[in-house]
Amino acid sequence: MDPERFGPKRAALTFDKDSGVAATAMSLADRSATHAARAGSMRAGWLRGSPDPRVEVVWRSGPYRVTELFFCPDEKTGRLVRRISLARSAAGASKVRLSTGVRERSIETEVAFRGRAAGPVIIEYRLVKQGVRSAVAVRLGTDPGGKNAAAAYWKDTAECRFSDPSLDRFFAAAKFQLRAAVSASGRLDGSIWQYNLEWVRDQAFIAMALAMSGQPGPARTILARLLRDFVSDEGATLDSSRLRPWEESELDQNGVLLFALESYLDWTGDLDLIRANWAKIEKAAAFPLRPQFRNVPSGLIVNRREFWERHEAHGIRMGMELAHQLFVIMGLRSAARLAGRLGRTGEAQDWTEAVMLLRKAMLKDKRFSLIDAGAFIKRRGIDGSVQREVRPDPGSSLPRQAPLFGPGRHLLDPDTSAALPIAWEFVDPAGRLAARTLASLEKLWDQDWKGGGYGRYNVTSEPDSPGPWPFASLFVARAALEAGDASKARRVLDWLGRVPGSRAASWFEFYGPRPVPPYPQVGIIPWTWAELIFLFVHHMLGVRPGESFLSVRPKLLPGIDHMTADLPLRDGRLELDVRRARRGQLPGFTCGSRKMPYHRYGLGLELPEKLERIAVRAIIP
């Protein structure tokens, strides 16, 4: 694909409208037959232990064993290398003809065996311009070797090991693929091959994950572009690559962007990005506080578009959405701290006061709080009544085979967005509110399907197909781990390891039948990779940097007794070694010559102005 131009699968530059990608297949011709990969004879996967992203494909045909290695050796140019090595069962001298190509362009070369091995043969694919459009050029090349520009880039990124091959692969693949999904200019499709559109929310979370995984460059590019191009002069944010009328504004996006900016700053120390873009940051913070967005009796934020983008046609009424209150409050809290770091005390005070009032109304208001029967609820109307169900517009173009149009009531709760205040510790994860909320979300596991996974919300109000959602399931996994239920987090990861796409660690938006049309076919969601990075770095390793303070609060999953990490942090590195205490072993933390007893709130360290390397050893229950 051209990274600067979104498109469906059929827009791939290697795709031919008649033959698909058949021309890219490789064949070997000897004196007796032509050999090629066949279904069932091929194994593909990430190359285990490689410091940079490499995919290995191994297949057999006749006497030949073929190993193909795919990788990108450059950071600044669009170049893919395909390294082909051949082996055979018999020794001796002989030759084969190797053929492959791209669309109408073919390549052939003669390969000589000396003994049982031959090669490697290097095929090089380059992204080139043909007028205003892009194309792929293919040629025979030379081996770039192991010390290339891309390898140097990946050497400086985060390294994490969890004593579990699946989780090690998930982390590495999430780190690799987040970078691959972002173009040089910062463009990023919300769902690869599916939507061909961009969202501030998704990209801000992805920028956070890039910073956590030691990739500040692309994180900065994304955030700078969002502030420049995706925040209007009034402070509204774009979703689906467009601005909407005020009633449809996805106000949580303003908060997520501000929250991501503070997280990026805490990880990188890059205050210049904040200073240079303060005018847009100020507008993004002020926008949700405009009078038209406020419920007069409570002060809470109102609109007619919910977190998952259902709106009036789906039966959503004007009201207060849980996730919108959450992220506006979290974002304003971040904006206030950013203002304080720039010496803008007036704005810091104003936004802090707004945070306190909104938080009090969200959690404590007897009529308007987003809590009912001791658990978080999704939505209230402007009169304070809980919006428990929806009735879709009978004249809408929504697909009639969806559960939303089935018989019976169409309920909004439970909704996995209710896990987010727990996952981000907006409320006490060990408290009764968190426990009751998480218990209510268990209705979404296997609600109308078999095999596991959480649906994004009550399936009876689903305008799409019933089925589990990977990134929504990770909301619950993160919240459960913070609440002390590590088995629920493990269950989600085990489920991700079973579903299609797990080998590549590239998951679809959801798993279920799709009404196509009117909806596009499902694609691969980059946000899922960000959620995995959050689970691994923020929750399991428990690394939470602040302005001048570092908190380390590690948590081990069932079946994992040891994990290590080497994480870039500002101008230095954080080295972390976490082990489960053996019988009779006293839990605690060691940092240099300091030894501290274990506490469930973890270890707190003051960050030096010039950070080089911090090494922490943790023995935890």
Report the location of each language-model feature.
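Structural helix-adjacent loops and short alpha-helical linkers that scaffold large soluble proteins
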Residues: 160-168, 210-223, 264-282, 293-296, ...
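Terminal accessory carbohydrate-recognition/targeting modules of carbohydrate-active enzymes
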Residues: 1-166, 482-485, 525, 542-621
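Short beta-alpha connecting loops at secondary-structure transitions
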Residues: 109, 240-246, 311-314, 318, ...
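Substrate-binding groove/exosite segments of carbohydrate-active enzymes
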Residues: 152-275, 320, 413-426, 453-483, ...
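The feature captures the catalytic groove of carbohydrate-active enzymes
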Residues: 118-139, 190-192, 238-239, 244-255, ...
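Generic recognition of stable, solvent-exposed alpha-helical segments in well-folded globular domains
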Residues: 169, 173, 201, 205, ...
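Non-catalytic carbohydrate-binding regions of carbohydrate-active enzymes
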Residues: 344-386, 429-575, 579-583
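Active-site-adjacent bridging/hinge elements
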Residues: 176-187, 226-235, 258, 299-309, ...
